[in-house]
Amino acid sequence: MEIRKASVSDMFGWLISSFKLVGKYWGTFMLAALVSLAAIFLLAFVAGLVIGLGAAGAAMGDVNSIDWQKIALMYAAILLVALILVPPFIAGWFVLTGKLADGQSASLGDLFSGYGDATRWKKLIAFGFIGAVLNIAVQGGYILICMALGIGSDDIGQFMSAQLNNDPEAMAGLSSGFWAAYAGIILIGSVLQTAFMLGFCQVALTDTGAVDSVKDGIAATLKNLGSLLLFMLAMLLVVIAAALVIALLAGLLIAAISMLNSNIALALGAVLYILLLLFIYPLMFSFQYLFWRDVLGGGGKPATVSDSEVLI
């Protein structure tokens, strides 16, 4: 397996190509994103209903009367079901994206193509299980090391309390050591996410086994770690700047409309949020696919998308 090295400029090239790809096939991607959001909301509703029924019978406000062991078992069962059902759907996203990126015809049916191949489905489940175990081991090991060294360990209780109570003053009072450890978790999580998504493309789009796909994803990430970290840093700055501008413009628009009708402003805010989600899903999968294709896959250049073909 040849693992190719990419530069920061290559990664920005994938990002630009992703925007163009989503723009060219806007309708197909939006329908796929709508199906995905509907599936997520349905799973979240069912999960909430199951857990809620598990807590039924508890006195109002009496946390001690809840059977937490039963809740934990239900939560574990939900995670197990998700581990079985979700991977083929994600694989379908990469199949759909790959066809569009390579200029092939694609349809919403490609989202569910992973469910029709039992052998591949088993590989996807195995990959998801291995990835989950590795993620817990690495992140858990990092947290244990930080606690053993006393880095931010004294602030964990304060952080959890501040999160639950939405207390910004308590958050501001956390030590610099805690924030350094917290930044480390985010960094490690981002690197692991990249490795797992590269490996997931490998297991979903090739005949490579689950274990070898995990190894390939990790190896490809480590080989491109320097460029990846620089790209992440640059993107962090870009995202912060873009978020501030978008939030300001959206806030001004919603505030202006709320002066006329608060219900319309609330509905507009919900619509803008949903549109953002509908755009993020295709962009994310497009970038990950192009990343995999040029580093682990066929290595061909991304399909050319002219500016005249982009429909935004």
Please state what every model-predicted region is.
Residues 1-312:
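Hydrophobic alpha-helical membrane segments
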